[in-house]
Amino acid sequence: MENGGAGTLQIRQVLLFFVLLGMSQAGSETGNFLVMEELQSGSFVGNLAKTLGLEVSELSSRGARVVSNDNKECLQLDTNTGDLLLSEMLDREELCGSNEPCVLYFQVLMKNPTQFLQIELQVRDINDHSPVFLEKEMLLEIPENSPVAAVFLLESAKDLDVGINAVKSYTINPNSHFHVKIRVNPDNRKYPELVLDKALDYEELPELSFILTALDGGSPPRSGTALVRVVVVDINDNSPEFEQAFYEVKILENSILGSLVVTVSAWDLDSGTNSELSYTFSHASEDIRKTFEINQKSGDITLTAPLDFEAIESYSIIIQATDGGGLFGKSTVRIQVMDVNDNAPEITVSSITSPIPENTPETVVMVFRIRDRDSGDNGKMVCSIPEDIPFVLKSSVNNYYTLETERPLDRESRAEYNITITVTDLGTPRLKTEHNITLLISDVNDNAPAFTQTSYTLFLCENNSPALHIGSISATDRDSGTNAQVTYSLLRSQDPHLPLASLVSINADNGHLFALRSLDYEALQAFEFRVGASDHGSPALSSEALVRVLVLDANDNSPFVLYPLQNGSAPCTELVPRAAEPGYLVTKVVAVDGDSGQNAWLSYQLLKATEPGLFGVWAHNGEVRTARLLSERDAAKHRLVVLVKDNGEPPRSATATLHVLLVDGFSQPYLPLPEAAPAQAQADSLTVYLVVALASVSSLFLFSVLLFVAVRLCRRSRAAPVGRCSVPEGPFPGHLVDVSGTGTLSQSYQYEMCVTGGSRSNEFKFLKPIIPNFLPQSTGSEVEENPPYQNNLGF
């Protein structure tokens, strides 16, 4: 009985839902299928494709699936063949109770585009239940004066089957007093009445009994039996009469248990026990017996179980009043259940797609259906989502909704959405239901790697070891997964003369930069190149950055003395007159340093001297000057060692050796002016005289006298011959060139300081530059020396 009541409740819900469905789906295609109950799971129901006129391939490509209203999966669809199969054994009595026909409604959900097709599955009854009497023994008390053809009620049998398989007829054992007559009640169920064929005589037969048999219409038919005992009583010739033949009442579905529904009342004209009335439900269904209770004495009908308008909207109850003599009267009570807003909306999810790509608008995220079991405004619903999210709800047929993206999403801004779908009814008070989903956004390669800096400046000391880590670059990608994996590379240099591949390398995984070989500041002070960062997306995205490498100078070059040149040939001798004043400029030590900056700042100091204190060296310019007055006691020859030191760390140095000759009566040298042409002519005559004198080697004494005379004559003349110094001619080594322009000399010089011989005019050359520039291409050329010349005084 309980299963039957639940089935009736479900059937009423299904019928109500599909009445609304039929109104909203007018004109849509419907597939009708028929199946017998109790078939095994996997049994063939029908071919959906043929019934609806669809292609089998369309079912598979559009992801067709069967969706039921109560979320039960009774059917399954084979998308490869289009066949509908049973997912479970169907029990018609459990599904529909006593309702006939038993029709189940399903929808076929198809995507791209979203479409709903209706399926009606009629479950046909089989004769799997026998009629059953609730009371195995019935007791009837019949007055002896009951007229022939008097009718007496018998309890009906219950058969869960319907249609032809339900109870069809009743029979009793053949006897001379009674026969059975079959009646049909308002709900089309048959019940038996016992008809008196022959008057009863209490004195002759006070009691008799027979078997009541109920037969259904199945093949073969099933039956059930009960024992009927008839007790003959004395005369009771008045039946009870109700005050109203029909009662109609209304009751709210949320009424509390024990509430009084209605009171029925009847009377009997008899007296004594024959007028004592007893109220009962006549042939009431199980739902009625579970929900209501009648007081047999007072006729009060009270509520014993909760009401549910959505399950049963009304009850029709036959009330029987029976007197003490067995006579009865009947009345009908109709109880109308009034709906209250006691059901919150329901959400049934059909499909959810997560994660979804970030760059695809109008993507269907979720398909769901809403419903409210209430009626009227209580069953009207409003569906909504928060306004601050890029999603939109679109309604479809039969209260189906789709949740779609409103615009392209950006995973880098937000990778996850927690969406709350709220369904609110319009009843009083309003009830709502919320459904939360978490939606993940999958990454699309829409962000190129970004360097932390647009340009990088790296510093590297020269003379580095190969494979030295000189710095790192870094780029980040806002994407995720393989789209965020960055690979670094060197880009082709725009300078065709820069051998970038032999200078640096880069680790493709972490961006570490390495120097491939040792660098020389004097050859390469700086260079720049571009690096690229590419991700692993499809298509791959990339970006570039500029890298500048500045080579830092190391103190790896010692000072080089340009003058006096230390080449192992005849030493350079400087002549100083004994009459020179303190601070007299003897000579200037000229040196350069191939380094730059502080490493090329040179300082000079006198390291050794034949006579300390006689000469001094200026620290910043290398000038060698006399420190005091010269005297006759000072030696004629002096050897000076000048130390040239740079300002590097550690400092490097070089030495220059000078020979100084003190000469008596030696005037200051000067360069002849253009107006001194007559004096030059005298110098030429004197040269001829000296050559002749030197050719005369008659005696050493004569040579000494002539030498003394020559010296005297030189003092008087304006010619300014000085000592001889042989310096090589030709280019200097190219590594002495200050390539950066920041060295000690911006231009390198070679000096020639001697008196030329073999010339008709005694031309005196003093610190004349003979090499204007040091060129890099002269590196490694040999140094040539001019043969020493002697002036006509023999120095």
Curated annotation (Swiss-Prot):
Keyword Membrane appears in the UniProt entry: yes
Keywords, in A-Z order: Calcium, Cell adhesion, Cell membrane, Glycoprotein, Membrane, Repeat, Signal, Transmembrane, Transmembrane helix
Extracellular side: 27-690
Subcellular location, principal: membrane
Pfam entry (one): Cadherin_C_2
Biological processes per GO annotation: cell adhesion; homophilic cell adhesion via plasma membrane adhesion molecules; nervous system development
InterPro entries: Cadherin-like_dom (IPR002126), Cadherin-like_sf (IPR015919), Cadherin_C (IPR032455), Cadherin_CS (IPR020894), Cadherin_N (IPR013164), Protocadherin/Cadherin-CA (IPR050174)
Membrane topology: Single-pass type I membrane protein
Disulphide bond pairs: none
GO molecular function annotation: calcium ion binding
Location within or outside the cell: Cell membrane
Gene Ontology cellular-component annotations: plasma membrane
UniProt-annotated glycosylation sites, renumbered to this chain: 418, 436, 567
Cytoplasmic-facing ranges: 712-795
Domain Cadherin: 35-133, 138-242, 247-347, 352-451, 456-561, 568-671
Protein name: Protocadherin beta-12
Highest taxon in the source lineage: Eukaryota
Keyword Repeat in record: yes
Functional description taken from the UniProt entry: Potential calcium-dependent cell-adhesion protein. May be involved in the establishment and maintenance of specific neuronal connections in the brain.
